[in-house]
UniProtKB/Swiss-Prot annotation:
Transmembrane segments: none annotated. Pfam families: Ribosomal_L35p (PF01632). The gene is rpmI. This is Large ribosomal subunit protein bL35. Belongs to the bacterial ribosomal protein bL35 family. One of its GO terms (cellular component) is cytosolic large ribosomal subunit. It comes from Mycoplasmopsis pulmonis (strain UAB CTIP).
């Protein structure tokens, strides 16, 4: 049986850190920024770590 392919859409959106955690960017940033507060826009600039409860599901999608 051939290897499972990684989900290409997900590969482009996340990075795996050296310790195996999953890093992702904040959502709701691409447009309609005038309706958001300065604080919301500033805090969404930085990437954040994915929640632990999502690790198992996402690691299965990006296995190599």
């Amino acid at each position: 049986m051939p290897k499972m392919k990684s989900k290409s859409a997900l590969k482009k959106r996340i990075k795996i850190t050296g310790t195996g955690k999953i890093k992702r960017h904040q959502a709701f940033r691409s447009h309609l920024a005038q309706n958001k507060t300065t604080k919301q826009k500033r805090q969404s600039r930085n990437a954040e770590l994915m929640h632990k409860s999502d690790y198992k599901r996402f690691k299965a999608l990006i296995q190599k």
